[in-house]
UniProtKB/Swiss-Prot annotation:
The lineage of its organism: Eukaryota, Viridiplantae, Streptophyta, Embryophyta, Tracheophyta. SUPFAM superfamilies: Homeodomain-like (SSF46689). Transmembrane segments: none annotated. One of its GO terms (molecular function) is DNA-binding transcription factor activity. This is Myb family transcription factor PHL11. It holds the Pfam family Myb_CC_LHEQLE.
């Protein structure tokens, strides 16, 4: 078997020298390999290049598909191995840099706080303890809110009872006479309209009254007043009733009213008038 005579660079006069061997050996020189790499790069890389396309692009006589197939396969394997090595080296570098960064952070944390190492050792218990602490705090706040609500409710109930007792005492202290269900309704209406009767409406209704305020008992510090109204005759014939000392008559059913005569230390005296008859 005869070998290919490469001459100086593996090819002579633009082509590879031929032999009678169907599978002649070829020494891939640096120049020949560079031309192969240029052809593969022009075709889009080793994955896209084919032996036939490389053969046409190189255009060397004596270069067969057998030579290009084997060389292209070796070239692809070499590129894959190079990529793998680059990936492994890059991963090692990334791992080393991350380890160094973590080491620096951990050392800085320990230098700032000596208890960091204990927390790192008990890292499994830290989240559970933190959650328990938050839960206990939430329960305490909830209990405090319940206590505040209970106190407010008790105060509201006490105020309601106090108002009810005041209304009952006021109702008992007022003489209602032969009061029935209608009198009770009038009493409730009177409680609602009491402030209005004491206000400007009372002044308009009693526009004909003459008020005379004078000081009685000059040496005494307490002031007494007397209101005298115009007297009119009672047309209905109702008897004049003088209420007991210390009470004011507020019966809404009576046709005649009462004027306040004297309010001293020992009681209240009133006299009837017919303002109610005029208003009715």
């Amino acid at each position: 078997m005869e070998r290919v005579n490469l001459g100086g660079l593996g090819y002579d006069n633009g082509g590879v020298m031929m032999t009678r061997d169907p599978k002649p050996r070829l020494r891939w020189t640096a120049d020949l390999h560079d031309r192969f790499v240029d052809a593969v790069a022009k075709l889009g890389g080793a994955d896209k290049a084919t032996p036939k396309s490389v053969l046409k692009l190189m255009g060397l006589k004596g270069l067969t598909l057998y030579h290009l197939k084997s060389h292209l396969q070796k070239y692809r394997l070499g590129q894959q191995q190079g990529k793998k090595q680059n990936r492994t080296e890059q991963n090692k570098e990334n791992a080393g840099s991350s380890y160094v960064h973590f080491d620096n952070c951990s050392q800085g944390g320990i230098s700032n706080d000596s208890r960091f190492d204990n927390h790192q050792r008990q890292s499994g218990n830290v989240p559970f303890a933190e959650a328990m602490r938050h839960q206990v705090d939430a329960q305490q706040r909830f209990q405090e809110q319940l206590e505040v609500q209970k106190k407010l409710q008790m105060r509201m109930e006490a105020q309601g009872k106090y108002l009810l007792t005041l209304l009952e005492k006021a109702q008992k202290s007022l003489p209602c006479g032969n009061a029935g269900e209608t009198d009770k309704g009038q009493f409730s209406d009177f409680n609602l309209a009491l402030s209005g009767l004491v206000g400007s409406d009372r002044k308009n209704e009693k526009a004909g009254l003459v008020t005379d305020i004078s000081h009685l008992n000059g040496g005494d510090s307490s002031q007494e007043f007397r209101l005298c109204g115009e007297q009119e005759k009672i047309e209905t014939g109702d008897a004049c009733v003088k209420p007991e000392s210390g009470f004011v008559h507020f019966d809404l059913n009576s046709k005649s009213g009462y004027d306040l005569l004297n309010c001293g230390k020992y009681g209240i005296e009133v006299k009837p008038n017919v303002i109610g008859d005029r208003l009715q």
